[in-house]
Structures are given as structure tokens and as C-alpha cells.
Amino acid sequence: PANDYLLKKFFRIPLDENVSRSRINAILFYYTAWYADNGGEVTEANDYDAVGIWSLPGQHLPATLSDDPKFNKIFFDDLDKRKYEVLPPSMGYYYLFMIGKDLSQPNVRGSVRTILNHYKERADRDNCAVVLEAISEHAKSVYEYFGFRICLTFKFGEKEVNSQGILDPEGEGFTGHLMIYHKDGEKVLRL
């Protein structure tokens, strides 16, 4: 639900507009191509069982602002501010825009691990960080397992949707976590 909410916001689609799974998939394909066209990397593991969309140190794509100032403040102003408070000056970082696993193949395991480990190894070699936002508690626990540290916990979608993404003017929205990995995180990240 949180991913669909975010895609609607990024594409300026009203939250009350019906959006089919085909249209959500088209938005995902658009972002995949946009990242690939603009110097990002699209990586896969286990014959596309998992796919990750990344930007590279010094080559981050411009923000795709929504038409919602409150959302933009959270996702672009607040998260960027905290990221730069935590990272040492001039430290580069890999940014995980999105990662997905083919849930129709539950017997295929280790795909997300393969992708995350590849970028952690690159970051270690380059003395860079890896930055991402976990938009579910499950994702947060997976990233913590891989050594990511929570830098900021934030709410989004409050008073717009409930935790299932259903419109609700009193809804609690979603909880996200800005997370950063660095091989020497205990020493260099300013948490």
C-alpha cells in the first residue's frame, strides 16, 4: 500500500483516483527507464526475481516533486536535511530508489540479498555509504539485518490514508525510516 501511495504522489495522481495494477506497473517501468536513461543502474538477481533501481555517488537524479507541499517537505526537505547531517561532508553514497521481489516465486531465495550485498561491497570499496528509505516494518528489519542504521523515523500520508492505503481523513498513514549503511558506520555516521 505505501508503494502505491508514493507512486501516486510522485505522478501527481489524486489519491481518490482509481489506478489499476497495470497503471502502477507502467509507472514502475517509467521510473526504471528514467533511472537507466539518466545514469542510474537497474540491477537484477536470479533471472529478475528481484530488481533494484539505484543512483550512484555524485550522479543522483533530480527530485520528482509532487503537487503536495507537505509530502515534498517530508520526502525531500526533511529526509535530505537529515541525510546530510548524518553523512560526513563530501562522502558519496549509493541511493536505492526502489527494490522489488517477485512474490510469485517464494521458492527463489536470496535475490534481494544478492543485490544489497553487491552495492554494499561497492560502497565499502569506494568508502561510500548506501542510503535508502524503508517504507514498511518488514523492510526496516531486512535492512537492519544487512547493517543499515535508522537515521530518522518519519510519517507520511497522515490524515490522507490509513495504514492499508485506503482514503481516510483521520488515517494514520505510513511509517518510514531513513536508513544508511557504511562499513565504519559506528565511527563515521553522525547519528
Model-predicted regions and their roles:
Residues 97-104, 131-140:
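Conserved beta-strand-loop-alpha-helix junction that forms the acyl-donor binding cleft
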Residues 107-119, 123:
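Glycine-rich acyl-CoA binding loop
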Residues 122-127, 136-160:
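Conserved active-site alpha-helix within GNAT-family acetyltransferase domains
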Residues 173-178:
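Short hydrophobic/aromatic beta-strand or adjacent loop that forms the aromatic wall/cage
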